[in-house]
Every structure is written in C-alpha cells, then in structure tokens.
Amino acid sequence: MKYSKLLLLLVSVVQALDVPRKPHAPTGEGSKRLTFNETVVKQAITPTSRSVQWLSGAEDGSYVYAAEDGSLTIENIVTNESRTLIPADKIPTGKEAFNYWIHPDLSSVLWASNHTKQYRHSFFADYYVQDVESLKSVPLMPDQEGDIQYAQWSPVGNTIAFVRENDLYVWDNGTVTRITDDGGPDMFHGVPDWIYEEEILGDRYALWFSPDGEYLAYLSFNETGVPTYTVQYYMDNQEIAPAYPWELKIRYPKVSQTNPTVTLSLLNIASKEVKQAPIDAFESTDLIIGEVAWLTDTHTTVAAKAFNRVQDQQKVVAVDTASNKATVISDRDGTDGWLDNLLSMKYIGPIKPSDKDAYYIDISDHSGWAHLYLFPVSGGEPIPLTKGDWEVTSILSIDQERQLVYYLSTQHHSTERHLYSVSYSTFAVTPLVDDTVAAYWSASFSANSGYYILTYGGPDVPYQELYTTNSTKPLRTITDNAKVLEQIKDYALPNITYFELPLPSGETLNVMQRLPPGFSPDKKYPILFTPYGGPGAQEVTKRWQALNFKAYVASDSELEYVTWTVDNRGTGFKGRKFRSAVTRQLGLLEAEDQIYAAQQAANIPWIDADHIGIWGWSFGGYLTSKVLEKDSGAFTLGVITAPVSDWRFYDSMYTERYMKTLSTNEEGYETSAVRKTDGFKNVEGGFLIQHGTGDDNVHFQNSAALVDLLMGDGVSPEKLHSQWFTDSDHGISYHGGGVFLYKQLARKLYQEKNRQTQVLMHQWTKKDLEE
C-alpha cells in the first residue's frame, strides 16, 4: 500500500540501548570509503524512524498503524494488546489507498486515494468514508474524479468538512451541503492559494473546527488582481516532447505586486449560517492572516493572528462567535526586523478554578529571545514561562490535567535541542533528557500527554524509546538502528566537529566541519563551503548528518575536500538581534560572514588556500552569487544552484518580510540584487550555474537573467558554465536530473582540486574582443 506503514512496536521491555550513543558523530571503525553510488544514487546507510498516529478517542496511549499484512490495527502501548480495525482485504480502493484518518470515536475511517500532487504540501484525491462495524464504504462525493483538495473529520459528531474546486462543503452522515458557491481560479475557500501554502500556513488546509465541533472557522483568499506567472513544461512527462510546451499559470505575487486578500468566516455547522469575522486590524490590502486558533473549550472565541504586509506589525484579534464582535487582545511592534509566524497558539483555559481569566500559550521573541508566554484571552500583559539567552523552538504537547507544557529549546547550545516541561502554575522547569550532553532530541506525545516516543536525532546514530511521563526510564526501545551501527563499522567516515568562529563585531558564527577520513595535518586539503544562510534558517545542528554528497566529497580519495557549513548572521536560534541584522539588506552581511570564514580557513596550515570552493542551493545559491560578486579573492570556485538573483523576481510575502517594500527600500533592493560582474570574471576556477526550467518557486527567470548579465558584461566561457534541467522543479530530480547534478558538481570539484595556478587560456580571454 502507498500509505506509510507504521510497524508494530517492539513488545519486549528494555531499560537501555545495547549500544550507548556518544556526544559526537561516528567516524566508523573500518577502512572503506563512501562511494558516489552509496551516497547519491542510493543512500545505502540511512537510519530509520517510526511514527504513530496517536488516537484521541481511545484510552491514552493507543495508536493506529498499518500492519505488515496491510490491515489497520490499533494497539495500546500500556497493555500491549492489539486489534484489527480494518482488514487488509476490506480497505476501499486497495493498493491505491494513499492515506487515512480515524474518526475520533473510532467508528469510521476517512480514506484518500487516487492522489495527484499539486504544490509543496497540497494534493488532489478521491475520498471514501468507511464504517468500521459494517466495513462498508461510500465516496465522499458520488461524482468525485480525484479532485477533492482537502477533507477533515470534526472532533465531535459524524461530520466532515471538505473542499472541492475551491468551494467548501460539509458532509453530515452522508448528506452533503455546499457552503460556498463562488470558488474558482481566483477564489479559494478553506484551502490556501500558492503563496499562503508556501510562505504563511505551510500546509494544505485553511479550516479549523471548534473543539466541540459546532463551528468551523475558515479562510478565504481572493486572488483577483494578483499577477500570473507562467511556467513552461517542455516534456510534460512524455517520452517525446510535444510541439508546444504545456503551460502552468500560477497566481504569483512578486515584490510590490497585488497580494491575495484574505477573510475569516465562521460557519455554524447545525444551521449552515456563515458570518464573516471583522478582522480589520489592518487594511484589507495590507492584511496577512498567519494563524487561526480556537481560544475556548467549546466554540465561544476564535482568534486570528494578523500581520501587516511586511510582517513587522502583529495583532491577535479575538472574535466572539455569538456577537461576531472582534477585539485586539495582543499587539506587537517588530519594526527592528520582522515577526515570524510560528503557528504556536495553544488554549489552556483558567489556571486556577477561581481565575476569571482564561489563557493561551504562545511563543514570542519580544525579549530578544523566543520564549513561552501565558497570554490572557481577554487581553493584557503576557506572563513569561521561560527566559534566558536561548530560545524555545517548538511546543510539543500541553497536559492540561497536570498543567505542563512540553517543549524543545536551545538552552544548552543553539545547535542542539533538549526536551523540557514547564509548569504553567508553578513555573518549574524540568528536563526530560540529560541537557548537559550535546544532542538533538524530539518527541511525539500521546493524545493526553501520558506517553511519548522520545527520538534521539544525533549527532550519533538516531534511536527511539517509549516513555511514560511519570518515569525517566524507558518502557521499551522502538527503533535502535542496529543495522546502521553494524554497517558503519566497516567504514572510515568523515570526522564531523563543531566550533564557534568569532567575528570582529563580537558575534560568533556556528561552524560544522567535516575532515576527510585518514586526515593528516601534514597534508594540504581543498575546502568546500556549503551554506544555506537564509533568514531564520539553521544548517549547523548536532543532528545525525546524512551520509550524502557532502560526506562523499570528503571521502572520495580523488577529492578529499574539507567541508565547512557556516551559519552566518541572519540565521536562526541565536536571538532576535542576530537574525534581524539582515533586515532590508539581504546578501550583505551573509556574504561578508562567508568570506570572513574563508579567509580564516585559508590561514590554517592544512587548508589549500588556492582551492576554496563554495556551493549553495536556493538561498544558498543566491548567497554564493553574492559572495562571488564581492570579488574578495577568498574563493576560487563557485557552484550556484537554483538561485534568486534579484529579489524583485521572488514572491512578495517572503521577500517583503525581510526587505520591506520596493517603494520604501529601493536602494536595498538594488544592493541586494546581483549586479556586479568583476568578481565572476576574477574567480580563478570559474563557476557553474544550475537551475530547473520547471521551478515554480524560484523561477528559472533568476538564472536566465543572471547568465545574461554575465555574458553581456564579457565574462569568459572559461569562467562561466551553466546547466539547465528540463522541467525540473526547485528540487531538480526530473528525468535523472538529481544524479546528473551531483556528478557535474563532483566533476567541478575534481577539476578545481587539480587546477594549476597558471591556467592555459584561449586567446579570446587574453585580450579584449574587438567590435
């Protein structure tokens, strides 16, 4: 079956792993070197993990998984008892089943099949409702043709909200009611358009049932006036190219262009009455709704987190569903940078029975560091639950009975994640793992927070264990990745270390270094910088580092590159000041930091300062371009993959968050664009530009314009190399494009390592061309 198989958890109880993990990445015990085929063509050594779909309608600790025979099975981790929910031969559409969602009372299953991917998160599918007792199933819509965009169970009752052709519908015990009738190419109800899916909500839905199931809040997006961008597909998934390319037309607002307008509506499930909520925190053309959350146990209050267009002003607007009256209960000025949409609002209610106020929990960085706060639903000053020069990265679960919030933070170091709980009644903080040891943890909690699967994510080989929140001893091991531990014994792996590089300005940059196997300080090694560097991003972490292309270039005896990944200013989890420094000037400080790091690396005796490369993808490709443009001489090779070259070409909601509008920052946009060519002319080993022609995110336009600039200004063909990947999107994988890309990159690195300082050049590079 195509849906994820969530395998049966191990029954035997173990108190500890057979092989304890170390606070550093493994280096292997053997002599084998990683090969291209093992790291790129197929990642042969890859740890696995298991996830479960915790059930809210059963005893806490129950979850559902697909057994080896394909049947849906419910198991309780306390009793180790299991029962079949749906036999494999009774699953509707059989092997075409793509995913499933269990009704909260376990009476029915909602199946998706015949799915077609749309954008990063969204897909179209057919949906079926199956009764668990009779095993009979019915289509959500009798005439469905793989065209339903989203469907979701209500938490109470036998109701499903779903979206088809951008219109909202409600399914009640088999009866379908159409709620909206103006959905179409320019109007979306309950699902996001491209830009909200990609940049704001990060998901494929825009509807939320109230906790009691009596109301549904949903967003609508009107794209009237939003400019269209056309992506051409030359092969269109055919063996022989059609005479005319297939064209995908996307409403794609670029900088200073018209954005979609957004509204919040409230649907009474029983009466089917719809009211538009008055979210007038900003003018309609200046409004972004980033989050919707019910601040109630029933349906009395719903809140919208509203931002202005450039996302440096924020207001939380609470709406009373009975009166449809809106009140601003929280506001924030973030004009020193930007305000991230963290999607972290969680209702907890009154803290004490005598309290008149109810509260919700949210993450805010208004102190300069991202921390947990209690916010009164009626408005007022927030109460801090955590504080310090470190950041809370996510809320994992809230146990309202014990009044505990479970969260991850960088308290030990910005490159690490440790698991804690904090009481929102006593403010006591408790680590659930040893937070004095370098590690990268995460966890998945049961519906009532009584149990959790703890995942050790690195730097050593990952594993998972099952815990009860009443004990610090594991109930059992879920995944030990013993196979990976055994595999790596035969290899000599790159040695990964971490350090902080001080800047002259006083800040420090996190650096992850890979040294080739068998490293000797008596040799000289070329070095490859591999930045991403985008706002709020983080590449330097103590996660398990995949044995991928970066491991290969350090391992291949004909390459043996040292690699440095440097998180420059603007990246995340080091405080607001550090990340906000790049506001209105993307590409400036980031490039300065990468150049400074390269200059420091060049002073290391075992680094070959004549062969220092840099390669980045997406924002990393843009950053590589800006580094070369600086003409610092610090780098001798650049590989630029799927870059932005001019921020006017990218979408408005991402770009204006950091750069603000073109009319208020024209100089900043001009400086941030790649405009100067001398650095490209002077980079000794040349550079390579790669891009997919079907990229619907960072459009091929960026690389086309960059190459035109460089050619037009006389950059020689010895220096300028470019590669287009037909119909590939931002990930570059279509028709073998991914393997080709990495082969090409390996070839460039080999050529750079063996490049002599005196390069033989054709005569046209030795003198100016005459008209």
Swiss-Prot record:
GO cellular component, one term: plasma membrane
EC number(s) per entry: 3.4.14.5
Keywords for this protein: Aminopeptidase, Glycoprotein, Hydrolase, Protease, Secreted, Serine protease, Signal
Enzyme class: hydrolase
Pfam families: DPPIV_N (PF00930), Peptidase_S9 (PF00326)
UniProt GO molecular function: aminopeptidase activity; dipeptidyl-peptidase activity; serine-type peptidase activity
GO biological process: proteolysis; proteolysis involved in protein catabolic process
pH dependence per the UniProt record: Optimum pH is 7.0. is active between pH 4.0 and 9.0.
Catalytic function, reaction form: Release of an N-terminal dipeptide, Xaa-Yaa-|-Zaa-, from a polypeptide, preferentially when Yaa is Pro, provided Zaa is neither Pro nor hydroxyproline
Source superkingdom: Eukaryota
Main location: secreted
Residue numbers annotated as active site: S618, D695, H730
Keyword Glycoprotein on entry: yes
Keyword Signal: yes
Gene3D superfamilies: alpha/beta hydrolase, Dipeptidylpeptidase IV, N-terminal domain
Residues with glycosylation annotation: N37, N80, N114, N173, N222, N470, N495
Signal sequence annotation: 1-16
Role noted for this protein: Extracellular dipeptidyl-peptidase which removes N-terminal dipeptides sequentially from polypeptides having unsubstituted N-termini provided that the penultimate residue is proline.
Family named by the database record: Belongs to the peptidase S9B family.
Name this protein carries in UniProt: Dipeptidyl peptidase 4
Organism of origin: Aspergillus oryzae (strain ATCC 42149 / RIB 40) (Yellow koji mold)
Taxonomic lineage: Eukaryota, Fungi, Dikarya, Ascomycota, Pezizomycotina
Gene that this polypeptide is encoded by: dpp4
